[in-house]
């Protein structure tokens, strides 16, 4: 989604990831969810090396199965989860994770209702995410690492796994 794209762009542009923009296919973050569309759009041309795919997801239900002819062009496909939702990073950053856990509210609803001190706006928009996190980039990195410690997902399936 837009929030994930904005976060990844921030981390990439500030050299916080294990890879740089020039390492990326087309030197950009690709927002294609469908394996069929991805292979047609990005793997249909001759390439001098295999591609490593990172997928940023908030659900384990999404499947990404490349066709057999395209599988040989990919070295690995890794899913990185921001479950239950990317808004969990706001909740952790604002020091409200324990309170959030006690309730029964989705993260985006919790942020909207309980974090009144946060700037108003669409918390999932690229502009909002950039305006909120860019001035506190070190805090974003700390929050991603903190989330990796809290989540039941294995470390290698969190955004922290691709941080420098």
Please tell me what each predicted stretch does.
Residues 5-25, 38-164:
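C-terminal accessory helical subdomains adjacent to catalytic cores in phosphodiester-
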Residues 30-40:
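N-terminal beta-loop-helix "entrance" segment that forms/cooperates
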């Amino acid at each position: 989604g837009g929030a994930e794209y904005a976060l990844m762009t921030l981390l990439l542009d500030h050299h916080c990831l294990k890879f740089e923009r020039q390492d990326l296919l087309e030197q950009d973050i690709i927002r294609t969810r469908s394996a069929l569309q991805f292979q047609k759009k990005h793997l249909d041309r001759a390439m001098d090396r295999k591609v490593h795919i990172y997928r940023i997801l908030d659900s384990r239900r999404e499947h990404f199965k490349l066709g057999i002819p395209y599988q040989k062009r990919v070295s690995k496909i890794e899913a990185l989860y921001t479950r239950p939702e990317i808004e969990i990073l706001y909740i952790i950053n604002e020091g409200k994770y324990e309170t959030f856990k006690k309730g029964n509210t989705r993260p985006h609803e919790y942020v909207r209702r309980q974090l009144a001190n946060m700037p108003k706006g669409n918390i999932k928009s690229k502009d909002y995410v950039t305006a909120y996190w860019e001035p506190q980039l070190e805090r974003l990195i700390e929050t991603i690492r903190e989330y990796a410690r809290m989540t039941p997902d294995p470390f290698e399936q969190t955004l922290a796994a691709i941080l420098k």
